[in-house]
Amino acid sequence: MPLLDGPRNGETVTASAHNGIPIIDGVDPSTLRGDIDQDPNRRQKIVVVGLGMVAVAFIEKLVKLDSERRKYDIVVIGEEPHIAYNRVGLSSYFEHRKIEDLYLNPKEWYGSFKDRSFDYYLNTRVTDVFPQHKTVKTSTGDIVSYDILVLATGSDAVLPTSTPGHDAKGIFVYRTISDLERLMEFAANHKGQTGVTVGGGLLGLEAAKAMTDLEDFGSVKLIDRNKWVLARQLDGDAGSLVTKKIRDLGLEVLHEKRVAKIHTDDDNNVTGILFEDGQELDCCCICFAIGIRPRDELGGSTGIQCAKRGGFVIDESLRTSVNDIYAIGECASWENQTFGIIAPGIEMADVLSFNLTNPDKEPKRFNRPDLSTKLKLLGVDVASFGDFFADRDGPKFLPGQRPSAESIGAADPNREEEPQVKALTYRDPFGGVYKKYLFTMDGKYLLGGMMIGDTKDYVKLNQMVKSQKPLEVPPSEFILGAQSGGEENADDLDDSTQICSCHNVTKGDVVESVKSGTCKTIADVKSCTKAGTGCGGCMPLVQSIFNKTMLDMGQEVSNNLCVHIPYSRADLYNVIAIRQLRTFDDVMKSAGKCPDSLGCEICKPAIASILSSLFNPHLMDKEYHELQETNDRFLANIQRNGTFSVVPRVPGGEITADKLIAIGQVAKKYNLYCKITGGQRIDMFGARKQDLLDIWTELVDAGMESGHAYAKSLRTVKSCVGTTWCRFGVGDSVGMAIRLEQRYKSIRAPHKFKGAVSGCVRECAEAQNKDFGLIATEKGFNIFVGGNGGAKPRHSELLAKDVPPEEVIPILDRYVIFYIRTADKLQRTARWLESLPGGIEYLKDVVLNDKLGIAAEMERQMQELVDSYFCEWTETVRNPKRRKYFQQFANTDETVENVEIVKEREQVRPTYWPKDGANEDFKGHQWSSLSWQPVIKADYFSDGPPAISSANIKRGDTQLAIFKVKGKYYATQQMCPHKRTFVLSDGLIGDDDNGKYWVSCPYHKRNFELNGEQAGRCQNDEAMNIATFPVEEREDGWIYMKLPPVEELDSVLGTEKWKVKKGEAVDPFEAYDKKYSGMKGKRAGAKGIEGSKPTRSPSNTIDW
């Protein structure tokens, strides 16, 4: 069905009609039913009001259960402009900024119902319900009839409207995508200022994390009126531990604070907070996460009974007080309770969908909902399950009985009752772990509990509470047994155990989906069962169940490199090594699924890396060049504007004055931007592709080598000066660093790796966060391995102590080769060591104790690689045949800039990328006319192997990409719309079993199809596409393209039109520079701060 949006700019949108049921605009609802009810064959229509997580769960379950009878048609009306998205994962939006990544189902799902009518409205609100006529009225004026009405209107975030200043600019709530987008926009314009989250519950911690992840605010503070966070889920001990962990992460938490007033300026902008205790706090932004209010406004005019605390009152069948109207999710009030977490809503969806589709079976009842939660909040694992406050409030239930709502707390107040609950508590202040489990007085039944830091046993314990079976072990074993560690394991769980509370998925659901053949990958399991698509906390357990079920069926869980290679990276390495396969074609014929496959952007670089790790060929040799990522293809890192960086090797950070002069002369001659790197060398940016050969010729003549900054290989070995100069030095760190860098330079590995050597325990070279690091001792060096910085920093681990200098090399040889042999694709040593069975102790056994008996072989392999070393740039500049690769265009010597250059701090750089790309339908553009035009000689392209070659050509002001694949030609625009980068001709070509080809953009891996009916479509980002053109080789030796007139071509695809220009992006320092303009110090200039006159401080005062 088409997307049905509500009014935008005054528009009115009306949905389509099905099965004779009209949707009429502006007609009295009493006239609408007509003869509809008299048709005995018609399907009943269910109208769902709301399109959130619970609503879409209900629809999915209803469709599945109604697949045979096909009794119902469905209309769903959503108020937001988006289809249903994962509100639990809302904070991840800050990372990817793509709403599509949050969609619970792709847009195509909404049009996939072939056996029933399914309509959906977006941007449309239901304003009235007419139960007597069974119709609803929308904000567009449409009248929609129903047989069954399901209210899933959700809830609104609460704002403290009685607090002065609650309506100021800078006040936000954390509830919807639009809330986040407004917060992001505000934060971008208030960089460096203070943001505040009010509310210490689940939503408040999520909001605080989101504001922190924005990285725009200078600081973020959390305000909570309670004595500890998560007061509804945790007791004082547990909540205080979570508070401590959050503070350790850098978030300031203020407890027992109530907002009395919000301070504002004359323009009603937030400037601060006044608390009830008189304390004040300066801030520019306040995000309130203090609770939710059920959306029950439709109840007033409709006559639906609503609870005093809000929400449509429902019974155990989810019925409201009005016939044929049901309520589910956060808008429903059951026994005077509403539920702000998703699990009870999913349970309601289960009950209602079952009852509507199984009228001949015993109906399900919505009884005591499971309010258990397991989450990772600000990096802290938190869980509560069962009756987790039974010790504080008294048990809500006891095995074998369930007290009514009225009987709880109805005992004689003058009678002192015996406690009915015993608590078993475990605290580990060193590991940051807290557990409290609540049992009946005899210890035979588990009632509930809470966990901080270690939540592995959550699923098992929660199931024990639900089953209400007597325990088979004493309570003490629940604490002591949890200390054995290990991954989450589902082997001893019953099939009825709920593993995903967000979507009420049991272990049996996952097992059945795999055994039936419906799900063959973990992605299939997520799509089919919805497990793991909510908060994601259940994924380790889901993965464990999937793996075990596949193994039980005799099927191995795939860790294949890609669709073309049925081996893991480590297995493929062994196949290539043992069979001595030396080319991509040899590998595909011997190890690929299809011998003549082109491979893809995943397997090509991986195979190229393995071949380099084993045989060290030159990357620019014909049979290897087309396998490389763009950086390796041109022996330089590609930058934002299509230029490249130039990084000579500076071993150990030591460099002579002559080489510094040579670098400076090259940078000045070619107008390169210079920067000192963290690896103690000089990076020169802005080198044009056509200048790379000349630049490197001068550097090679000056005695310099490639620094391999472009490669998945050794980058640098950083050092402090050690005993070379430092009076505190214990060892010669520079000498050792230079020897290590000279030995391992150019060695290809699964990922880049870095080293460092410190001359003493002061650790100035930061050796303990490198892939390998040495720290000098009085007896030699301590060797550390498996560390890295980056997005997920890891401290390295000690491999060996007090190693003499002459014994360092054998140990590192074995370590590096073992990593190369066994790591997964693109896996850093940190992640490799974490996933290595046995971890550091196993690595010591292999590397130090030669447990596998391969130490000598690994040393020999490393020595062969070291002996095969050559400088890639030295060999390249001496080979004139490689010059053709270093041209901007294959058909002309002209050059153009793809991004406008700006001058800053006496250097040049490309201007900032704008936020949005080129959002035009290039694929669907209709040209006025097309004619065949010769563009380039056919002999430019290779006849293979490899079976691929490409070229970037210039036609007018337009850049075009031509690809030769297995003897056929394909042509597209050169610009990738994502970031308006002109690079597609340098992208890797992939194929599938159906003969479909695609080119993968070198920048961010957008894959564009080259052939077939969908040529030009982006496979992994439907928001963009590219233009394609007919192309062929003719007998005259030229390649011809069918193109429009040059003027028309340039008007759509011209470089000048799409070149990124200054001013398109927001200057990130605009606010900073405006605020601190002119503050340069007394000696920066005679004028001092702009607009003020310099003054002399009295001589007898301190001049601060």
From Swiss-Prot:
Binding site for NAD(+): 146-176
Chain ranges of the Rieske domain: 932-1040
Domain of life: Eukaryota
Assigned protein family: Belongs to the nitrite and sulfite reductase 4Fe-4S domain family.
Full protein name: Nitrite reductase [NAD(P)H]
Record-linked Gene3D superfamilies: BFD-like [2Fe-2S]-binding domain, FAD/NAD(P)-binding domain, Rieske [2Fe-2S] iron-sulphur domain, Sulfite Reductase Hemoprotein, domain 1
Organism field: Emericella nidulans (strain FGSC A4 / ATCC 38163 / CBS 112.46 / NRRL 194 / M139) (Aspergillus nidulans)
Binding site residues for [2Fe-2S] cluster 2: 976, 978, 1001, 1004
Pfam families: Fer2_BFD, NIR_SIR, NIR_SIR_ferr, Pyr_redox_2, Rieske
Cofactor(s) annotated in UniProt: siroheme; [4Fe-4S] cluster; FAD; [2Fe-2S] cluster
Coiled coil: none
Gene name tied to this protein: niiA
